[in-house]
Amino acid sequence: MGVSSFYPPLHVQRRRKLFKILQGGFPVRSLLDIGCGDARFLSYLVPCNDQVPIEFLAGIDINEQSIERATEALQVRTEDFLQLRWRPLHIELLLGNIKDFTHYKHVDAVVASEFIEHCQVAEILAFEKLVFGNLKPNVCVVSTPNFEFNTIFEKLSTLTSSISSRTSTNFRHPEHVFEWDRKEFAKWAYKICKRYPEYTVEFTGCGLLNDLIDGDDLLHFRPSSTYGFCTQIAVFHQSKNNAASHCFLKDQNSSILLYKKITYPFMEQLFPPTVQQFMNLLKKAFFDHLFGRHCLLLFQVIAGKCALSVKLPFLFIWESSPLIRHAFHYDDSIYLSYCPELKKSKHKGIALANSFSFRIAKVLKKSRIFIITFHHYV
């Protein structure tokens, strides 16, 4: 039973949704992905980001081929040395069954995306004990297929068939042990909160009927709310956040195999950068652009024959340095917050000197374009 007719694709919607959930509360610096597969979600978390300030990632899966693919996906590459992170990142990939996984310390977040429907009853109980009894994360996110949505994939013309009778042939994947409807999923989640009263749960999801490429015709028969989300998500929050801690195995005799450890390079500098550091980076980006595209005019400026006004796309500055991206904090309005003098200036101009005796006489920010006027002073 396919789910490929969503736009954006369902797996993309799911990763975005999980990431957005992690943004919404206590800073997530350590995370365990249970049933990590080939590390698609872990890979999504690798780029340095202040919104989810990850420093430690761990993934566990029972399938060795999946862990091999995850290892390849998460390997440090040449570009990781060229675009250094501004905080450390350590990754551990583990091979084994969560039933044997009993000696793990606290992590800030646990994600189990499209995992629980592959579990037998004993594994579900082990999952509950591991996560809520031992790890006690500040947030745990569990996603699983919503069985009620399956009738859409069956393409029944009347959309009135009953889904109360279930067999594995009605499931989305032959390896699924079960698929819950919304009431069953909620019943399971509330039972966890009753057993572990420090947790509360809320429900969300991704993949609505109107996200289907051909879903408009179906909406004439039933509203999107009739079936809910294609992927249903439970978000468990702990009422009292624990201090951040890296996760590691305490029991060296555990049958869980530490398959791979990966450490990413990073720049050991304090952040955010100072205003002077930030301006130096901006000037470097400006001059790199000038020497690359306006070399002749720049020499005329040096000779005192003319002034030079250049429109510099914001994207060029953005891509010139990860430090600049960090300083801008994913929004060029931060530029002004770093430079309060720009707010006071009628023309939003600033005079800056550098070691080449150039002076950036004026910087105007209009529609994500920087207009820079250069003069040369002896």
UniProtKB/Swiss-Prot annotation:
Cofactor(s) it depends on: Mg(2+)
Chief place where the protein resides: cytoplasm
Subcellular compartments: Cytoplasm
Database matches in SUPFAM superfamilies: S-adenosyl-L-methionine-dependent methyltransferases (SSF53335)
Cofactor annotation comment: Binds 1 Mg(2+) ion per subunit.
Keywords for this protein: Cytoplasm, Magnesium, Metal-binding, Methyltransferase, RNA-binding, RNA-mediated gene silencing, S-adenosyl-L-methionine, Transferase
Gene3D superfamilies, A to Z: Vaccinia Virus protein VP39 (3.40.50.150)
EC number: 2.1.1.386
Family named by the database record: Belongs to the methyltransferase superfamily. HEN1 family.
Identification of the protein by name: Small RNA 2'-O-methyltransferase
Source organism (scientific name): Schizosaccharomyces pombe (strain 972 / ATCC 24843)
Classification lineage: Eukaryota, Fungi, Dikarya, Ascomycota, Taphrinomycotina
